[in-house]
From Swiss-Prot:
UniProt KW keywords: Aminoacyl-tRNA synthetase, ATP-binding, Cytoplasm, Ligase, Nucleotide-binding, Protein biosynthesis
An example Gene Ontology molecular-function term: ATP binding
Domain of life assignment: Bacteria
Catalyzed reactions per annotation: tRNA(His) + L-histidine + ATP = L-histidyl-tRNA(His) + AMP + diphosphate + H(+)
Gene behind the chain: hisS
Protein name: Histidine--tRNA ligase
Annotated source species: Geobacter sulfurreducens (strain ATCC 51573 / DSM 12127 / PCA)
InterPro entries: aa-tRNA-synth_II, aa-tRNA-synth_II/BPL/LPL, Anticodon-bd, Anticodon-bd_dom_sf, His-tRNA-ligase, HisRS-like_core, HisRS/HisZ, HisRS_anticodon
Subunit note: Homodimer.
The keyword Ribosomal protein appears for this protein: no
Length: 413
């Protein structure tokens, strides 16, 4: 037997309906805020992610599915969506008429990680990006939309945490202060943090190692080093969040695993998923578009993990009910049931039937399995008079209806 690859999961009927609900809710909510969908390729040039995410990040160093194709091109299965969206934005000059764009995407991402609850090698994200605006009202609106989305799913437990990572003007001084702080505590850091404490010191604040958490507990905070512009931006973002009625808390230790973030960063976190506490995360990336060869256009966005959202939805039932199950007794009745089913489906009615000519008792059990709203029973007598018994499965009420798609549809819709 050939089995699937570790960390690459099938989404089966019964579960896929939960995913469809997650995706449909995103489309509905995002459209309220003026977002349009963009579809991006799974395979990109490796250089895209090296330039955007950063050479010293865990993703680039350890986790990317990269290979050289038959044309000797270095390519990578996308580990995240923002870089691909920005590459498309630049390549197709979406900024030519208006630099402001509101885009969302959904689909699989790939990282070579140790599979565990809520973390897989093929995982799925829904993300949204806004380009062309630095106004903190946009930061607040993006965060408000994210919280609105989770509220629409009925998930109020994840809480919003925000921080500011400053800008190229104020971050270098903070970065040096953090390097000096870490240098005095190198013996307490994990090997990864020791190796890159000079090239990517902020990652030590986000390290999952208990030793690193303890060693950095008293580390300087970026919020204390913000320049006047970044401080004003963060203050205004918080003010607009409060005006929007969006609840948040400040987490001054929050950093992101991608190098392109500036100023506002955020996470939606929960205590219900163990170590995988973040279900959505993002931030502002005002230099990314120019770093990728485009104009100096700012941006902000987020991504959320579909698998983690599905876990939070728990045992909620999302499988739809067919409108009608047709139980047919005998070959002629089967033929009539098939004709009727096709006509009903063309009229927008969801219909199932039995194809094997089993007993009425067996077919009624099958109707129960499908959880159909109604069952139509057709036998020889029904064929003779051109009418059949329609049973409402929730109430048990039975009525006789003519055997035409229009008459049956009128009784059940």
């Amino acid at each position: 037997m050939i089995t699937g690859i570790k960390g690459f999961n099938d989404i089966l009927p019964g579960e896929v309906e939960r995913w469809q609900h997650i995706e449909a809710t995103a489309r509905r909510v995002f459209s309220l805020y003026g977002f349009s969908e963009i579809r991006i390729p799974i395979l990109e040039k490796t250089e895209l992610f090296r330039r955007s995410i950063g050479d010293t990040t865990d993703i680039v160093e350890k986790e990317m599915y990269s290979f050289v194709d038959k044309g000797e091109n270095a390519v990578t299965m996308r580990p995240e969506g923002t870089a691909s969206v920005m590459r498309s934005y630049i390549e197709h000059k979406l900024y030519a008429q208006d630099p402001v764009a509101k885009l969302y995407y959904m689909g699989p991402m790939f990282r070579y990680e140790r599979p565990q609850k809520g973390r897989y090698r093929q995982f799925h994200q829904i993300g949204a990006e806004v380009t062309g605006v630095t106004d903190p009202k946009v930061d607040a609106q993006v965060l408000t939309m994210l919280c609105h989305y989770f509220a629409e799913l009925g998930l109020t437990e994840p809480t919003l945490q925000i921080n500011s990572l400053g800008c190229p003007e104020c971050r270098p001084a903070y970065r040096q202060a953090l390097i000096d702080f870490l240098r005095e505590r190198l013996d307490s850091l994990c090997e990864d943090c020791k190796r890159r404490y000079q090239t990517n010191p902020l990652r030590a604040l986000d390290c999952k190692s208990a030793h690193c958490k303890e060693a950095t507990a008293s580390a300087p905070a970026m919020l204390d080093s913000l320049c006047a512009g970044c401080d004003d931006h963060f203050t205004a973002t918080r003010r607009h969040l409060e005006r929007a009625g969006t609840t948040y808390s400040i987490n001054n230790r929050m950093v992101r695993g991608l190098d392109y973030y500036t100023r506002t960063t955020f996470e939606l976190v929960t205590g219900l998923l163990g170590a995988q506490s973040a279900v959505a995360a993002g931030g502002r990336y005002d230099g990314l578009i120019s770093d990728l060869g485009g104009p100096a256009i700012p941006g902000i966005g987020f991504a959320m993990g579909v698998e983690r959202i599905a876990l939070l939805l728990g045992d909620q039932h999302f499988v739809g009910r067919p409108d009608l199950f047709i139980a047919a007794l005998g070959e002629e009745a089967q033929d009539e049931a098939f004709r009727l089913m096709c006509g009903l489906q063309r009229n927008g009615v969801a219909v199932e039937m039995d194809y094997e000519g089993k007993s009425l008792k067996s077919q009624m059990r099958r109707s129960d399995k499908f959880n159909a709203r109604f069952t139509l029973i057709i036998g020889g007598d029904e064929l003779a008079i051109g009418a059949a018994v329609l049973k409402a499965m929730d109430t048990g009420v039975q009525v006789e209806v003519p055997l035409t798609p229009e008459e049956v549809a009128a009784r059940i819709t």
